[in-house]
Swiss-Prot record:
Renumbered residue ranges of the record's region Disordered: 246-273, 369-524, 560-601, 631-669, 720-757
Xref: Pfam families: Spt20_SEP
Stretches with biased composition (Low complexity): 469-509, 568-582, 636-650
Gene name of this polypeptide: SUPT20HL1
GO molecular function: transcription coregulator activity
GO cellular component: SAGA complex
Source organism per UniProt: Homo sapiens (Human)
Bias type Polar residues, positions: 423-440
PANTHER family linked to this entry: TRANSCRIPTION FACTOR SPT20 HOMOLOG, TRANSCRIPTION FACTOR SPT20 HOMOLOG-LIKE 1
GO biological process: regulation of transcription by RNA polymerase II
Protein's recorded name: Transcription factor SPT20 homolog-like 1
Family of the protein in this entry: Belongs to the SPT20 family.
Length: 823
């Protein structure tokens, strides 16, 4: 196909070259006259015969229409192009040869000019040309003479450049002619009109070439290209840039004067204006210049009263009810304790959270320092996630909250011998016993302690424990399986525990206590804490106890129980087994041979103690321990000791012993100290305050814990005490974790529910004070609050004297990240 097209193009070039050099002569019929096209062809043949052989010379076979008009004096249509904004005009020739102007148009109306460029007869001129006195049609075409006065306007007389254009009819003009011819008053049918139109087309159309060769089309395209090569759209745009419609707006803008606001005054005009204006220049002396605003008199009357409410502007604080913020279930927490602050004392409000992970029975805690609370704060409730298994937390001096709690333990209780660490966790681990509300039972099930003796291999499957909530509904808790709750503990020598005692410059750390936090979905007013220490012994003996307490107790009466004095190893009596804090390695271990027991007592309200000395408020750590008496060590040691009391036998026990969940052994080893006499706490529940009488022996507090201070003692009424003789109690270190509890009133009907074993935690606000302060006197503040408390103790085997066993805490204070306990 490409080859045929190339051959057709070559043939078209040859045809054009032959036609330009030697066009053939035509033969016409002698009867008919020649048409306009035939006349033009004859002139072309004549001019080609005169063509010189030298191609460099000029050709004469051009401008054929001008030569035809000069030869035959054919009438034509005259179009004048005037310079400037004069526009153009159309003139018709009269019979005497003069021209009369018919139409004058500006250059902006380019419709007629576009028809002239296309060499087409405009349909709008049909009526004008038909009414002309001279027939200007030649074979249906019109010859137009264009006189251009724009380039020779400066000549006198003005000259012009002339060229002729042949306007050929189009289908529009033929339709217009048919319409004009049928207006003669006769009736023309549609067929007659179509026949007339066909005759006009045949008469005015050029001869057709019906040769199927492609060379014919290529020849016609080449001739049209040579004729319209300078009449392209880009060339038209370039020429219109210098046409009058484009130049006229520019000239009009240059001729118009600018508006007065935009006129620029010259420098001479400015100087002329300044000539008549006097200039007053006053230069003041140095030091005598006074500002204008200072020189003005200012007499302001001081108002006697000011309405602050009208002048003050209040800003609405963003609340949880704002639709733009996500609405979270908020829980209002307020400080139930009324501390009096002194000058220079920095108040710290800590809200510890005690919880237990799934992979380890050792308790996890999180202590966060809060800002100074001047008003009630709203806080979103803590939501546990069952998939979160965080490692246990260890209190330490890395944060202010841990340091405040450590100083509170140091100033009130004995000094720590084996310090432990606490690392803060950003995510709250899930509670082991997630409480959910169920139907209220008639008699709630009690909770019992399960223990096993090392070496015998006796294990019991942990039963499902149900704890009654304060609202009267049952909450179920899942205990640990035996393989997760117990792990072997490494014994340690007493010398290693004694060498681990920190100096006075070191800050003691807070021990851990095992607890479980309830699920926030149920939101019971009472928080549930579980203490389940497990001790593994090499040699079996009597007197050692493991404490496992959980469950609520309803009542309003404080309980107290006595204990037998513990003698130091040097006094001849067998020393109790110590548990070293440095040996606390894992969070759980198998329990020794322990006999479970349950103690139920009625307590109307818990007792909350606060310490106030003449020097000011001193930090005091409140603990809630089992119902057995608990004694802390003397002032010369820095370790916390918890002495488990003898098993209490309560005649009103209504439930038999059942196997309970295993716990972990918690505690730090300390040296035994003799307690020759028993001291009782004297409490008046009806009063808001009661004095403490300083005594030279340590104090015993059975319900909420024991806080021993050098040279001090407190005493309980004998009516509230329950005594049970035992050979010798062991020494266990208490590791407390604190958990906030909201104050809620309980109805009297709920206070008569059966009692269960439970340890209640309270929110403590600690004041940061120096560590080494000798406390001589204490003032005890007792607050009554309807909560649920219970304690319990069971007797286990006491180890051989001189043997210390325990679990070692692997995490050290210098480590930045806590090591998760072994499962």
């Amino acid at each position: 196909m490409d080859r045929d097209l190339e051959q057709a193009l070559d043939r078209a070039e040859n045809i054009i070259e032959i036609a330009q050099q030697r066009p053939p002569r035509r033969r016409y019929s002698p009867r008919a006259g020649k048409t306009l096209q035939e006349k033009l062809y004859d002139i072309y043949v004549e001019e080609c015969g005169k063509e010189p052989e030298d191609p460099q010379e000029l050709r004469s076979n051009v401008n054929l229409l001008e030569k035809l008009v000069r030869r035959e004096s054919l009438p034509c249509l005259l179009v004048n192009l005037y310079p400037g904004n004069q526009g153009y005009s159309v003139m018709l020739q009269r019979e005497d040869g003069s021209f009369a102007e018919t139409i004058r148009l500006p250059y902006e109306e380019r419709a007629l000019l576009d028809y002239l460029d296309a060499e087409e007869l405009p349909p709008a001129l049909g009526d004008v040309l038909d009414k002309a006195s001279v027939n200007i049609f030649h074979s249906g075409c019109v010859i137009v003479e264009v006189r251009d006065y724009r380039q020779s306007s400066n000549m006198q007389p003005p000259g012009y450049q002339s060229r002729h254009i042949l306007l050929r009819p189009t289908m529009q003009t033929l339709a217009h002619d048919v319409k004009m011819m049928t207006r003669d008053g006769q009736k023309w049918s549609q067929e007659d009109k179509l026949q007339l139109e066909s005759q006009l087309i045949l008469a005015t159309a050029e001869p057709l070439c019906l040769d199927p060769s492609v060379a014919v089309a290529c020849t016609a395209n080449r001739l049209l290209y040579n004729k319209q090569k300078m009449n392209t759209d880009p060339m038209k745009r370039c020429l219109q840039r210098y046409s009058w419609p484009s130049v006229k707006p520019q000239q009009e803008q240059s001729d118009c004067p600018p508006p007065p606001e935009l006129r620029v005054s010259t420098s001479g005009q400015k100087e002329e204006r300044k000539v008549g204006q006097p200039c007053e220049l006053n230069i003041a002396k140095a030091g005598s210049c006074v500002d204008t605003w200072k020189g003005r008199p200012c007499d302001l009357a001081v108002p006697s009263e000011v309405d602050v409410e009208k002048l003050a502007k209040g800003y609405q604080s963003v609340t949880a009810a704002d639709p733009q913020l996500p609405v979270w279930p908020a829980q209002e927490v307020e400080d139930p304790f009324g501390f009096a602050l002194e000058a220079g004392c920095q108040a710290w409000d800590t809200k510890p959270s005690i919880m237990q992970s799934f992979n380890d029975p050792l308790l996890c805690g999180k202590i966060r320092p809060r800002k100074k609370a001047r008003q009630k704060s709203q806080k979103s409730p803590w939501q546990p996630f069952p998939d979160d298994h965080s490692a246990c937390l260890r209190p330490g001096s890395e944060t202010d909250a841990g340091r405040a709690v450590s100083q509170a333990q140091e100033s009130v209780q004995s000094k720590v011998k084996g310090p432990g660490k606490m690392s803060h966790s950003s995510s709250g681990p899930a509670s082991v016993s997630q409480l959910s509300s169920w139907k209220t039972p008639e008699q709630p099930d009690p909770v019992w302690v399960q223990s096993s003796v090392s070496g015998k291999g006796e294990k019991h499957p942990p039963p499902r424990t149900q704890l009654p909530s304060s609202s009267g509904k049952i909450s179920s808790g899942n205990s640990f399986p035996p393989q997760q709750a117990g792990s072997p503990l490494k014994p340690a020598a007493p010398a290693a525990a004694a060498s681990a005692a920190p100096s006075h410059s070191q800050k003691p750390s807070v021990p851990l206590i095992q607890a479980s936090r309830p699920c926030p979905a149920a939101q019971p007013p009472t928080k549930f804490i579980k203490i389940a220490p497990a001790i593994q012994l090499r040699t079996g003996s009597t007197g050692l106890k493991a404490i496992n307490v959980e469950g609520p107790v309803q009542g309003a009466q404080a309980l107290g129980s006595s204990f037998k004095p513990v003698q130091a190893p040097g006094s001849g009596a067998p020393a109790p087994a110590g548990i070293s804090g440095s040996d606390l390695q894992s969070s759980g271990g198998p329990l020794p041979d322990a006999r479970p027991g349950a103690v139920q007592a009625s307590s109307p309200a818990p007792l909350q103690f606060f310490l106030n000395t003449p020097e000011g408020l001193r930090p005091l750590t409140l603990l809630q321990v089992p119902q057995g008496s608990a004694v802390l060590t003397g002032p010369q040691q820095q370790s916390h000791q918890l002495v488990s009391l003898q098993q209490l036998q309560q005649p009103t026990a209504a439930h038999p012993p059942q196997p309970g969940p295993q716990g972990s052994a918690l505690g730090l080893s300390t040296q035994g100290q003799a307690f020759p006499a028993q001291q009782l706490l004297k409490v008046n529940p009806t009063r808001a305050r009661s004095g403490l009488q300083p005594q030279p022996q340590p104090a015993v507090l059975s319900l909420l814990g024991s806080a021993q201070v050098p040279q001090q003692g407190v005493q309980l009424p004998s009516v509230l005490r329950q005594q049970q003789p035992q050979p010798q109690p062991p020494k266990l270190q208490l590791q407390p974790q604190w958990q906030p509890k909201p104050r809620q009133e309980q109805p009297q009907s709920q206070q008569q529910q059966p009692q269960h074993i439970q340890l209640q935690t309270q929110q403590l606000r600690v004041l940061q004070q120096p560590q080494h302060i000798q406390l001589q006197t204490q003032q005890l503040r007792v607050l009554q609050q309807p909560v649920f408390l219970a304690t319990g103790a069971v007797q286990i085997v006491q180890p051989h004297p001189g043997v210390q066993v325990g679990s070692q805490l692997v995490d050290q204070r210098k480590e930045g990240k806590p090591t998760p306990p072994a499962p």
